[in-house]
Amino acid sequence: MEALHKKIREEGIVLSDQVLKVDAFLNHQIDPALMKAIGDEFARLFADAGVTKIVTIEASGIAPAVMAGLNMGVPVIFARKHQSLTLTENLLSATVYSFTKQVESTVAISPRHLNSTDNVLIIDDFLANGKASQALISIIKQAGATVAGLGIVIEKSFQGGRAELDAQGYRVESLARVESLAGGVVTFK
């Protein structure tokens, strides 16, 4: 997606060979026009998938997921990282390790919102080592639902998450595939 590539080149900051900071438009400050275009693209890519719901993890996946949900006319569910007083029933949950934050957390979804008739599109801001995607897949399977595919805004192809998802037979559509961050330069695949 050229508009996303351009935004990454102009406003992304390479912090190391492993970390790309995109807080100017995706995961702190949000560019609504870009999010709309991202949602439109995910809707186009998965138009044939029979998606009934979209699942993401709070917080950075919410903006692109909502835009895709709006375009596709389906609800968006976000897995919560922190349990609240209103989230009390037997939860669908999984543990996920955040590469960026270097912490492990439990993410959860209420079983009221996800069931065996759902065909679920996972949308997330990044795909690195695939741990967040695997956690969401686990939650979807706990509900007896099916995974329609994964829509990733930015994939760090050099970190192996996609290879694992491909090996498991999941459809992965990434809007920007970063091959390398070496030398402080973003190289797209």
Swiss-Prot record:
GO molecular function, one term: xanthine phosphoribosyltransferase activity
Keyword Transferase: yes
Family indicated by similarity: Belongs to the purine/pyrimidine phosphoribosyltransferase family. Xpt subfamily.
The UniProt record lists the keyword Glycosyltransferase: yes
EC number: 2.4.2.22
InterPro entries: PRibTrfase_dom, PRTase-like, Pur/Pyrimidine_PRTase, Xanthine_PRibTrfase
Pathway membership: Purine metabolism; XMP biosynthesis via salvage pathway; XMP from xanthine: step 1/1
UniProt: 5-phospho-alpha-D-ribose 1-diphosphate binding residues: A128, N129, G130, K131, A132
Protein name in UniProt: Xanthine phosphoribosyltransferase
Quaternary organization: Homodimer.
Disulfide bonds: none
Catalysed reactions, as listed in the record: XMP + diphosphate = xanthine + 5-phospho-alpha-D-ribose 1-diphosphate
Compartments reported by the entry: Cytoplasm
GO cellular component labels: cytoplasm
